[in-house]
């Protein structure tokens, strides 16, 4: 036929059998990719340290999505929280991966069948014997079925009525586990961080979809609306389908980047705004002050801080620190976290506590500045020693650690103090193993960043596709140069497939 690459999809115009075939093949490819990618990730995933080397640090992409839906066990005998598993069964990572691969194979065979047997009676009007697709009715069927699936997910899977529930955690990502969720029917259900909204919104949207589907199955569109919106043209279906996809992509890009109950910190890593706003730092400070109020020593108060919480308060886990074109997992950048060294407290020679100013997200380098509780600069690591007034040596800065591996260890050597001041710019200080993976020391983004970038980019592309195909179907006669004052009762382009012998060649 000699079609250019960007027009090859015209081969399925006015060929509903093969249109179905290519969609089934697409489903086969998607399901096959999901299953295969899961098996690959399971082959490289190390579940031994869910606190300092969680899935998102290792660059896992599909495992977090499976986990948030209630899968936590592996046939290898481990689960995502670090416990030992005896009999994981089918509802496991390998079980679901295998199911997707088997489903992909069945879809592949179905696609071949529909490609070979494309000319089915169901596509023809029994009254006229001509090719006829009732697209509004097809829309109603799809809407009804998607409504049933949506309602079923919210009413059964999420609530635990028939299913495991979903991943639910506290606001600081410390106690996450899979559990049933009760629907939130009040105003709190609109809070994106309330898991109950997931159940209630799926139930409500499912009911709406079922009712809308029944409406479109039982009520015919007015002729003026049918003609005006080109409801008989398959390209109208393409345009509106692309609109649904790009809208969904924009939504999930937002919920992933800004955070929500659907994108837990434990599965996808912190958001950049949690670093920008000092979210975890403030919680750590609150816990330390609460410990001191209970007459605990500084060492005891800091030792009670969970290592998991301290690790979140480290800039290397900020998804905006890694460049989008730096390939690889976070562990390939700054290394595998081995342990928390503790919280450094800096003091000048008068004993006044100093605080290291933290690096903002979009800086690669940042001056090392130490300020007092009023925010006044008291010490720094100068760029030019000859002009320095606040150098560590001149001010007599010392550092002492509380909690972690260096608990109650102090340093007065200026070189060591400056080393830890530089590292304190990046949040809590951790020992990082760069040798195992030959990590290069350059920050990487987390799956949260990759997902957002991919979905926002494709949403923009699909938005353009929606405009393109919508304009083509609405203004097809204009683009083709048909006289707008033509009185003949014809629908131009009813048969527009190249080489179609049924195309009418005479003017009606």
Curated annotation (Swiss-Prot):
One term of GO molecular function: electron transporter, transferring electrons within the cyclic electron transport pathway of photosynthesis activity
Key words of the record: Chlorophyll, Chloroplast, Chromophore, Membrane, Photosynthesis, Photosystem II, Plastid, Thylakoid, Transmembrane, Transmembrane helix
Q: Is Ubl conjugation found in the keyword set?
A: no
Please tell me one Gene Ontology term that the record gives under cellular component.
photosystem II
User: Gene3D superfamilies annotated for this entry?
Assistant: Photosystem II CP47 reaction center protein (3.10.680.10)
Q: How is the cofactor bound?
A: Binds multiple chlorophylls. PSII binds additional chlorophylls, carotenoids and specific lipids.
Report the subcellular localization: Plastid, Chloroplast thylakoid membrane
The record, for HAMAP family, names:
PSII_PsbB_CP47
Task: Give the multimer and partner information.
Answer: PSII is composed of 1 copy each of membrane proteins PsbA, PsbB, PsbC, PsbD, PsbE, PsbF, PsbH, PsbI, PsbJ, PsbK, PsbL, PsbM, PsbT, PsbX, PsbY, PsbZ, Psb30/Ycf12, at least 3 peripheral proteins of the oxygen-evolving complex and a large number of cofactors. It forms dimeric complexes.
What family is this protein classified in? Answer: Belongs to the PsbB/PsbC family. PsbB subfamily.
**Entry function:** One of the components of the core complex of photosystem II (PSII). It binds chlorophyll and helps catalyze the primary light-induced photochemical processes of PSII. PSII is a light-driven water:plastoquinone oxidoreductase, using light energy to abstract electrons from H(2)O, generating O(2) and a proton gradient subsequently used for ATP formation.
The name under which this protein is listed is Photosystem II CP47 reaction center protein
Q: Which organism is it from?
A: Pinus koraiensis
């Amino acid at each position: 036929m000699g079609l250019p690459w960007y027009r090859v999809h015209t081969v399925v115009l006015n060929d509903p059998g093969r249109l179905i075939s290519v969609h089934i093949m697409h489903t086969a490819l998607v399901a096959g990719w999901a299953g295969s990618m899961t098996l690959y990730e399971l082959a490289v995933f190390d579940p031994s340290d869910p606190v300092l080397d969680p899935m998102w640090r290792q660059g896992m992409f599909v495992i977090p999505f499976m986990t948030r839906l209630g899968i936590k066990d592996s046939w290898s005998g481990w689960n995502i929280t670090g416990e030992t598993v005896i009999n994981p069964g089918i509802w496991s990572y390998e079980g679901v991966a295998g199911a997707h691969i088997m489903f992909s194979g069945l879809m592949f065979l179905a696609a071949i069948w529909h490609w070979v047997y494309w000319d089915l009676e169901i596509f023809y009007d029994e009254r006229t014997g001509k090719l006829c697709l009732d697209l509004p009715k097809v829309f109603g069927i799809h809407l009804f079925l998607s409504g049933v699936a949506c309602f079923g997910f919210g009413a059964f899977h999420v609530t635990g009525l028939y299913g495991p529930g979903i991943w639910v955690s506290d606001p600081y990502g410390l106690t996450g586990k899979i559990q049933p969720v009760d629907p939130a029917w009040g105003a709190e259900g609109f809070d994106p961080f309330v898991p109950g909204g997931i159940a209630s919104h799926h139930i409500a949207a499912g009911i709406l979809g079922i009712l809308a589907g029944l409406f479109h199955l039982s009520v015919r569109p007015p002729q003026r609306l049918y003609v005006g919106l080109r409801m008989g043209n398959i390209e109208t279906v393409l345009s509106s389908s692309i609109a649904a996809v790009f809208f969904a992509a924009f939504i999930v890009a937002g919920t992933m980047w800004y955070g929500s109950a659907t994108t837990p910190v434990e599965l996808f890593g912190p958001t950049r705004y949690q670093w920008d706003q000092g979210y975890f730092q403030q919680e750590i400070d609150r816990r330390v002050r609460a410990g001191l109020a209970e007459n605990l020593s500084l060492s005891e108060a800091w030792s009670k801080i969970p290592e998991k919480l301290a690790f979140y308060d480290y800039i290397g886990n900020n998804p905006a620190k890694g460049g989008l074109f730096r390939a690889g997992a976070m562990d390939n950048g700054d290394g595998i976290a081995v342990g928390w060294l503790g919280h450094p407290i800096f003091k000048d020679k008068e004993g006044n506590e100093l605080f290291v100013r933290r690096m903002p997200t979009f800086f690669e380098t940042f001056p090392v500045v130490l300020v007092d509780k009023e925010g006044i600069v008291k010490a720094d690591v100068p760029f030019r020693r000859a002009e320095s007034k606040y150098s560590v040596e001149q001010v007599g800065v010392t550092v002492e650690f509380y909690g972690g591996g260096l608990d109650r260890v102090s340093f007065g050597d200026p070189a060591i103090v400056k080393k830890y001041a530089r590292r304190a710019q990046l949040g809590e200080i951790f020992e990082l193993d760069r040798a195992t993976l030959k990590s290069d020391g350059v920050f990487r983004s987390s799956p949260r960043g990759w997902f957002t970038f991919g979905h926002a980019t494709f949403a923009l592309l699909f938005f353009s596709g929606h405009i393109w195909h919508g304009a083509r179907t609405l203004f097809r006669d204009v683009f083709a140069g048909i006289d707008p004052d033509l009185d003949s009762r014809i629908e131009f382009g009813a048969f527009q497939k190249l080489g179609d012998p049924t195309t009418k060649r005479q003017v009606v």
